[in-house]
Curated annotation (Swiss-Prot):
Binds 1 zinc ion per subunit. It holds the Pfam family PyrI_C. This is Aspartate carbamoyltransferase regulatory chain. The keyword tRNA processing does not apply. The lineage of its organism: Archaea, Thermoproteota, Thermoprotei, Thermoproteales, Thermoproteaceae. GO terms for cellular component: aspartate carbamoyltransferase complex. It comes from Pyrobaculum neutrophilum (strain DSM 2338 / JCM 9278 / NBRC 100436 / V24Sta) (Thermoproteus neutrophilus). Belongs to the PyrI family. Zn(2+) binds at C108, C113, C138, C141. InterPro entries: Asp_carbamoyltransf_reg_N (IPR020545), Asp_carbamoylTrfase_reg (IPR002801), Asp_carbamoyltrfase_reg_C (IPR020542), Asp_carbatrfase_reg_C_sf (IPR036792), Asp_carbatrfase_reg_N_sf (IPR036793). Its cofactor is Zn(2+).
Length: 151
């Protein structure tokens, strides 16, 4: 295989590396990136990786992810590494970890939870109760959820 770059470097933005193979689209979904935002996104799937065997990579030009967005990625890509790029240089690099609080991103799986009532303006909120593997509890009904189950 050639050692050339498959996707060009980005001047400024975020590179999400070490995503398990086949999970890049799920990463975009949890970030709410649809392609209609006007942000340039590069997606590379199933490339060789010494660490994972195969991996996906997502590059988001012109946008640095918020800490909340970074940590919510752990729901679908727990091995992901985040690289913040400025002037074509990585200025920060870190691994994702489950957030302490997840608010308004997912629905509670309990059908009788008040957050699922059609006329109740209650935003679902989950608290982290265990890091490995991540386990959350709904603050309204007390139901436990693994992070991947919230998707």
């Amino acid at each position: 295989m050639s050692k050339e770059l498959m996707v060009s470097k980005i001047e400024r933005g975020t590179v999400i590396d070490h995503i398990p193979a086949g999970r890049a689209l799920a990463v975009l979904r949890v970030l709410g990136i649809t392609g209609r935002e006007g942000v340039r996104v590069a997606l590379v799937m199933n490339v060789e990786s010494k660490k994972l065997g195969r991996k996906d990579i997502v590059k988001i030009e012109g946008r640095e992810l918020t800490p909340e967005e970074v940590n919510i990625i752990s729901a679908v890509a727990p091995t992901a590494t985040i690289n913040i790029v400025r002037d074509y240089t990585v200025v920060r690099k870190f691994k994702v970890s489950p957030p302490e609080v997840v608010k308004g991103r997912f629905r509670c799986k309990n059908p009788t939870c008040i957050t699922n009532a059609p006329r109740e303006p209650v935003e679902p909120t989950f608290l982290l109760v265990r890091r490995e593997p991540p386990l959350f509890v709904c603050t309204y009904c007390g139901r436990y959820h693994e992070l991947g189950d919230l998707l």
